[in-house]
Amino acid sequence: MTNSSFRLLPLAVALATSFAAHATDEQKLAELENKVAILEAKELNSVADKFSFNGFASLNMQLGNNSHGFMKSQNKVRFDEGSLIGLQGEFEVNDSTSAVVQMVARGNKKENWTPDVEWAFLSHKVTPNLTVRGGKLRLPLFMYSDYLEVGYAQTSVRVPSEVYGSVVLTSLTGGDFIYDVELDDSTVSFQGFVGSQKLSASKHSYNADTQFDDIAGGVINWTDDTWTLRTVYAQAVVSSTTNWNVKNKPPILNTTFNDEKAKFYGVGGRYDNGNLSLVSEVTRTTVEGFYHDVDSAYLTTAYRVNEFTPYVTVTHMESTDDAERNNQVKRQYVNMVKNPSAATKYAFGSAAAISSNMNIQRTTYSIGTRWDFMPNIALKGDVSYLTNFGSTNGGVNASYKNEDNILYTVKVDAVF
């Protein structure tokens, strides 16, 4: 009995040791799995920390006192024109490099909420003062260019069309650099940019693909947070092979671009002491060929009273080469009289259409207010009066060029 018990003892010890070892292995495996889960969670959190997202949206309601067509308005309430939503994402590749993408969907009739990539670029900080970027970038022609679609960043319901509408292109595909020089109490920034861009027919008012090559320019900006001064120059070569056309109408002859040179000059300034705000820009755009050369300017005065910011804006634009187009109309008219035919009548009609669309003089007076009634949301109201068309149609429907033309706008802007 005793001998048998002693013979079984090594076996019992071995089994106990085996069970203990097995339990220890399971425990170790569980601990290892737990560590892996913790590492995976940390990795996911680390990747998530590299992403940042924000967005912006505008709901725009506008009504014209007649169908003058300013800002695509009609004599009925419309919510599509000027309404949009945008999303912007940034991924931190490393401590000095990031990738940025911005998509915008606009409600206007032509785009009908189709998402469009406005920004898509890599940004690299070479030094604390020098940043280089490459990809699809905003064309930095104006003071509000970086916030062109972000209505919440603007005091009024919209940027002045007479100035910002003088250039149809808003982005370029290429590269730029931004170099900041820190002074005692202010900063001077130098920006240079190069690239090219195609304006597709789907975004063109007259349904014609237009190519912009050899885009190049520079910006100098000085600010001390109260005062800001800015100057910009840009140039490009414009080409297209399709004559302008609108639905159910024949194309307008001689409206293509054959490597025509375009230039842009601009100066701007802003004063903001926390309550009183003054913003102004003066620009000149020149384009070879049939397209108009335009001088334009605006001044916005605003004053903040708690959550309310009433403002007044005066804007003016004037094409400076009307005589060239008017003379072309006269030549085509004489030719039509001397050689009456369908072809000469078509040529005269095209010349007259170019003159009617490209000869523009207009002054717009706008008064409105902004109400920041909730965090990150602003309600705005605006009344704009169009006048001083001179001998032109003022860029509105020719049937109403001699009428009082007014646009009423109510808008909600938000960021998130």
Regions found by a protein language model. Name each.
Residues V47-H68, Q74-S200, F212-A216, I220-T228, ...:
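Outer membrane beta-barrel
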Residues K35, S189, A201-Y206, V232, ...:
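A short secondary-structure junction signal
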Residues E33, E40, Q102, E118, ...:
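Acidic-residue sensor for enzyme active/binding pockets
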Residues I38, S83, D116, S171, ...:
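Residues that act as N-cap/strand-start positions at coil-to-secondary-structure junctions
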Residues S196-N207, Q211-F212, N245-P250:
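Active-site-proximal beta-alpha loop/turn segments in soluble metabolic enzymes
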Residues T2-F70, S350, K411, F416:
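N-terminal periplasmic/intermembrane-space "pro-region" immediately following the signal or transit peptide
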Residues H22, G107-N108, V287:
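Short strand->helix junction
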